[in-house]
């Protein structure tokens, strides 16, 4: 299955970010804690070079806690400031302002020596579609400053948000990159909802998810759907359809409905806390 989604507005958004980065002290990059590496746009490292960097691993409530701890150590070792959080419940949000100040302390000291007082840290918030940038900004600012939605591509245009005397945020549209060199990256992005479902083969996506869960989280499908995990992936999807009574009007099993149900329940955390990639595997 081939994954690719790079609509024209993303090219325009990237050009705007390249222009706006000149105004920025700090790049705050949101990633999905279930796929912390695959949900990083590789263009951001080039865009944000010579800028202070903070990685926020959002949706940590849906991710495997041990994996999140390992990813946090992985990124810190590479020189990033890192926070794991759940922007929706605000869990993990309290420390962010202090970490922003810590990350930018050299800049603030330079300002002080130059006699520049009370100039706020300017941070650009970046991330791929559907990682929760708008929800993070709304939670952080304490009010609905940015549009939110559960479909990739909702936030558009330039938005500066003054959080306090100390911090200003520039929200940016979620952008992917033109080509996924590794189709496993595309698969993971599709599973978390960063690629529009309308262009995906949901049945094949569900089969890939079942294959992963059988090997990495054995027993989770049996517990949720009362299926026998020794079966083939397609047979397991059939079992899920039977368990959840996914039936067509003609009385046949509705595999597409079962596939969509499985993916939705994974995305919503109903299967448990699951991470789709681990740092030690990436290093091999």
Map each language-model feature to its residues.
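Helix-rich effector regions associated with P-loop NTPase G domains
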Residues: 1-26, 34-43, 47-53, 66, ...
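Active-site cofactor/substrate anionic-group-binding motifs, chiefly glycine-
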Residues: 51-61
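Conserved active-site beta-strand-loop modules that form the wall/rim of enzyme catalytic pockets
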Residues: 87, 137, 167-170
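Anionic group-transfer/hydrolysis microenvironments
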Residues: 31-34, 60, 140, 173
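Structural beta-sheet core signal
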Residues: 29, 55-57, 125
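Short, structured loop/turn "capping" segments at alpha-beta junctions
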Residues: 107-111, 138, 144-150, 216-221
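Glycine-rich phosphate-binding P-loop
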Residues: 122-142, 146, 172
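Canonical P-loop GTPase G-domain recognition
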Residues: 61-126, 145
């Amino acid at each position: 299955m081939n994954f690719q989604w790079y609509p024209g507005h993303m090219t325009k958004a990237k050009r705007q970010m390249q222009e706006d980065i000149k105004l920025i002290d700090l790049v705050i990059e949101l990633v999905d804690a279930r796929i912390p590496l695959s949900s990083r746009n590789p263009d951001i490292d080039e865009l944000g070079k010579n800028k202070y960097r903070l990685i926020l691993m959002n949706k940590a409530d849906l991710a495997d806690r041990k994996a999140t701890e390992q990813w946090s150590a992985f990124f810190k070792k590479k020189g990033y400031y890192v926070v794991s959080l759940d922007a929706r419940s605000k869990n993990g949000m309290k420390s962010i302002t202090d970490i922003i100040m810590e990350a930018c302390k050299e800049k603030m000291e330079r300002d002080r020596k130059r006699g520049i007082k009370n100039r706020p840290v300017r941070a650009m918030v970046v991330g791929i579609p559907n990682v929760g940038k708008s929800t993070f900004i709304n939670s952080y600012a304490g009010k609905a400053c940015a549009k939110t939605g559960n479909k990739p591509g909702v936030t558009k245009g330039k938005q500066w948000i003054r959080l306090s005397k100390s911090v200003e945020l520039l929200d940016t549209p979620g952008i992917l990159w033109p080509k996924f060199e590794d189709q496993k990256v595309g698969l993971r992005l599709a599973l978390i909802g960063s690629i529009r479902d309308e262009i995906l083969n949901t049945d094949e996506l569900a089969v890939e998810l079942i294959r992963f869960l059988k090997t990495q989280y054995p027993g989770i499908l049996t517990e949720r759907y009362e299926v026998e995990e020794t079966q083939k992936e397609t047979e397991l999807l059939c079992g899920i359809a039977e368990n959840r009574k996914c039936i067509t009007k003609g009385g046949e099993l509705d595999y597409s409905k079962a596939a969509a149900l499985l993916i939705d329940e994974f995305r919503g955390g109903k299967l448990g806390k699951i991470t789709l990639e681990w740092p030690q595997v990436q290093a091999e």
